[in-house]
Amino acid sequence: MNNINYQYDTFCKQILARPIFLAHILKQCVSEFKQFDISVIAKDCIRDIHVNQKNIHRFSPFLSQFEDDSLKEGKAVFDIFFVARLPDSDSDIDFYINIEIQDDFYPGYPLSARGVYYGGRMLSMQYEDQIRHSNYGNLKKVYSIWICLNAPKEERGSITEISLDKKVHVGYNRIRKEDYDKLSVILLYLGKESEEEILGLLQTLLDETIQSERKLAILEEEYGIVMDDETRKTTIYKVKY
């Protein structure tokens, strides 16, 4: 990636990491947040957002880590990483969430497999923070969300979720969903106009061909995005770059 593309890629991550946009993603893609207002999610549910940062302390009680090399597993670099909680939760952290912007749809391996791996890394990085002394019942659910910009034509405009499930082959058991439903990978394939709100919003936000004032107007008028001054400035700067 040359320097210009790298800087534009960084700008995309910085604007997407604004709480208002993360809140839209959570509400429309993460089932646990669907019943809550976007303004509440943006203000009260999202914390410790980091973009392309390294060497964040792994043992922080509010862990946010982009380059994880814990447990001698090698490095996994995350584009955007944050923790989230439900508005009515007594816990400081309910979810560990990673968001990736993927321009290359054919990097030489299945993106779904990489998403599962990233999810696994977010589970293992909780070892000291959540499951110390083998308290595995405190393991928090992880989401790895992939925004794919150049999907095959026939797959554009789709949203797919890969998650853990159980199959009882013989007899009956009492295993509760909340005890195994700990990892989901969500794939959003952009690339065409879509009636699905989150796809249209992301397509508009990440489309470098739309001029800044037009982009702001679409985000505000069609998607109801209420931006503070800093978010507006970041969006305009990204578009004008």
Give residue spans per PLM region.
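Elongated, amphipathic alpha-helical interaction scaffolds
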Residues: M1-Y241
